[in-house]
Amino acid sequence: EKQEELLVAMNGRAGRLTNEYLPGDERSFTIIAYPVPEIGNDFPKIFAEIVKINTLDYKQYERIQQTIIETLDTCQWVEIKGKDDNETDLIIHLHELEDVRKQTNFENCVADVNIPVGEVFTSPVLAGTGGILHVKKVYLNGLQFKDLKLVFDCGQVIDYSCANFETEEENRAYIEDNILHHHPKIPMGEFAIGTNTTAYVAAEKYGIADK
């Protein structure tokens, strides 16, 4: 436990030092993870799909996403409901705009910010933001989480569970070690809507989501 506290403190200090000497608003970078032949017999097709994903027409996505933004900028709240047996039920509180003609809550994120294109995002108002986020399967930093559930109140995680192990204690420890990193509370830093489904389709088609 003492080592975990030291690790959290070290990471926090390292982050502050990085931002002090390498300010985030003064640098930019792009990382593209191209597949290697070891990915399987479909390597040529998968490689072509990855190239396609990373060279989509960003102008088309920019127009689509601007329509989404203009609609969301008229809202104070966004309600997110899971489909079928997905238990997601979230309320996102948006910042109030004084003049929607001159102001916006959202970043129109295309290839000048991220490659591949495909999302609009904002930082929510923590007060009033809450509910449950349920993801049936997700990979974070190379680790799989099954039936991941995060419960939010006032925009912060107050409870959590997953179904990777047999006991609740093991599952909670897995989340604490690999998502929360032993912070007592983690705020919801971003609310985003993705528009690029090309990567998801390719991952499902070739069974490479875990690679």
Which residues does each PLM region occupy?
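Short, solvent-exposed amphipathic alpha-helical segments in soluble enzyme
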Residues: 96-98, 149-153, 207-209
